[in-house]
């Protein structure tokens, strides 16, 4: 580790294999917490390279506990987090709305690190059972249309890193990796990232896979469609720019999509919105993200996806999905 840290301090970069080896060694407990924290800090001070990101990703996927959901045409809606915006849980809400519209969802998530309440914090608060049992997860997909893949249960290799990330409480390269290491290897992905450079890296890595994907970055910094401005999109077919009017809605302000200040408040807000009792702004931003997921899977244009998402939300189908998952979790 000393040699690697000295090289990194001297502004050198790692090869893909070196990056992979580092993560494997971290997972094996080869380094102490101070060394791991120093290693993570390097990537807060300079941009990660494509080779480094690819190596880290390869290590995590090789070390993960895989779950076979290949019988289903699933999508994961997942953002990197780390955008510093503290929105409510938009991608998790959009996941339930997407499932309510009949699309199978394999939602990969974790506890919040740089935010107050991550996807797993809200799911746990609402009584959703975390499991890596394939029979239980298939049952969830079959009966509720969605399963929740709580990252620590599938990435035991990262147990040495979790407490350090929590103590640092800022985004690290693990934020960048989260959406890329879904252990069910979904056929479709809607991925939000916190900057344009990372969007390009994701595109470069995803174009060498069979994944049907849409990568999103709102130009004012959000790792999702925020409707507070335009959103850059990169798919396996094209690049584009989404405007709020592409969904037939008005521009929002940042305060319209602010999250709760506690996990409890975030969970209450989650249920309120999923019950169709959210503000128009909250409904629109959830349906824009769910709509893009639906459009990605079914090859539709954004407004077609948006209308299907809105029908799922306002008819109560999204809420019914949550209730089914809660019942299965008992």
UniProtKB/Swiss-Prot annotation:
Amino acids binding 5-phospho-alpha-D-ribose 1-diphosphate: 79, 82-83, 87, 89-92, 107-115, 119
Residues bound to Mg(2+) 1: 91, 224
Swiss-Prot/TrEMBL cofactor(s): Mg(2+)
InterPro entries: Anthranilate_Pribosyl_Tfrase (IPR005940), Glycosyl_Trfase_fam3 (IPR000312), Glycosyl_Trfase_fam3_N_dom (IPR017459), Glycosyl_Trfase_fam3_N_dom_sf (IPR036320), Nuc_phospho_transferase (IPR035902)
Gene Ontology cellular component terms for the protein in this record: cytosol
Pathway: Amino-acid biosynthesis; L-tryptophan biosynthesis; L-tryptophan from chorismate: step 2/5
Span of the signal peptide: none
Keywords: Amino-acid biosynthesis, Aromatic amino acid biosynthesis, Glycosyltransferase, Magnesium, Metal-binding, Transferase, Tryptophan biosynthesis
GO biological process entries: L-tryptophan biosynthetic process
Enzyme Commission (EC) number: 2.4.2.18
Annotated positions binding anthranilate 1: 79, 110
Binding site for anthranilate 2: 165
Catalytic activity: N-(5-phospho-beta-D-ribosyl)anthranilate + diphosphate = 5-phospho-alpha-D-ribose 1-diphosphate + anthranilate
GO function term, MF aspect, one: anthranilate phosphoribosyltransferase activity
Pfam families linked to this entry: Glycos_trans_3N, Glycos_transf_3
Residue positions binding Mg(2+) 2: 223-224
Domain of life: Bacteria
UniProt function note: Catalyzes the transfer of the phosphoribosyl group of 5-phosphorylribose-1-pyrophosphate (PRPP) to anthranilate to yield N-(5'-phosphoribosyl)-anthranilate (PRA).
Subunit description: Homodimer.
NCBIfam families: trpD (TIGR01245)
Family designation: Belongs to the anthranilate phosphoribosyltransferase family.
UniProt name for this protein: Anthranilate phosphoribosyltransferase
Originating species: Flavobacterium psychrophilum (strain ATCC 49511 / DSM 21280 / CIP 103535 / JIP02/86)
Gene: trpD
């Amino acid at each position: 580790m000393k040699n690697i840290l000295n090289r990194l301090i001297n502004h050198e970069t790692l090869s893909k294999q070196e990056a992979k080896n580092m993560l494997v060694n971290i997972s094996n407990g080869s380094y102490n917490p101070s060394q791991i924290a120093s290693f993570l800090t390097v990537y807060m001070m300079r941009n990660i390279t494509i080779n480094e990101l690819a190596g880290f990703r390869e290590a995590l996927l090789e070390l993960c506990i895989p779950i076979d959901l290949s019988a289903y045409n699933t999508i994961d809606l997942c953002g990197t987090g780390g955008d510093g915006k503290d929105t409510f849980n938009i991608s998790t809400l959009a996941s339930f709305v997407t499932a309510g519209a009949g699309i199978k969802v394999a939602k990969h998530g974790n506890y919040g690190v740089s935010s107050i309440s991550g996807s797993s914090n809200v799911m746990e608060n609402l009584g959703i059972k975390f499991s890596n049992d394939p029979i239980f997860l298939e049952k969830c997909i079959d009966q509720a249309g969605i399963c929740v893949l709580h990252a620590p249960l599938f990435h035991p290799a990262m147990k040495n890193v979790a407490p350090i990330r929590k103590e640092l409480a800022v985004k690290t390269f693990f934020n960048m990796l989260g959406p890329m290491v879904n252990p069910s290897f979904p056929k479709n992905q809607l991925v939000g990232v916190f900057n344009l450079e990372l969007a390009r890296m994701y595109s470069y890595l995803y174009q060498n896979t069979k994944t049907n994907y849409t990568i999103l970055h709102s130009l004012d910094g959000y790792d999702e469609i925020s409707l507070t401005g335009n959103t850059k999109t990169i798919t396996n077919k094209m690049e584009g720019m989404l405007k709020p009017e592409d969904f037939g809605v008005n521009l929002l302000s940042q305060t319209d999509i602010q999250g709760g200040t506690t996990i409890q408040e975030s969970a209450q807000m989650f249920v309120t919105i999923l019950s169709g009792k959210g503000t128009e702004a909250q409904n629109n931003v959830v349906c824009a993200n769910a709509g893009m997921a639906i459009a990605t899977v079914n090859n539709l244009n954004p407004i077609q996806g948006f209308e299907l998402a809105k029908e799922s939300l306002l008819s109560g189908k999204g809420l019914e999905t949550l209730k089914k998952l809660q019942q299965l979790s008992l």
